[in-house]
Amino acid sequence: MKSPEDLTKFYMHGTGHWLGLDVHDVGVKLINDEFREFKSGMVTTVEPGIYIRKDDKIESKYWGIGVRIEDDVLVTEAGNHVLSKKAVKDINEIEYLMSQR
């Protein structure tokens, strides 16, 4: 990536969302134009990703590829607890897991 615009070209979503009664639970991120403070008991996701669309000016062999790796994080009094810490994230482990389908 060569410019800030490249980031939005391949990363057209936020970095996460609330988790609760639903996978994409409701809740505001801003209160009075300030980012909401995390409080113990809240659960959020951290999910960077990249998506390569067909209209991008890159080699066609990469068109249609999308990858997003998500962690689910519980906010605690002491900081946080990554609920998904045992989820497979290494590329070799992911490829092995997908080959078993």
Regions found by a protein language model. Give the residues of each.
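Internal maturation/activation junctions in enzymes
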Residues: 1, 5-12
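Charged, cofactor-coupling segments
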Residues: 8, 15-101
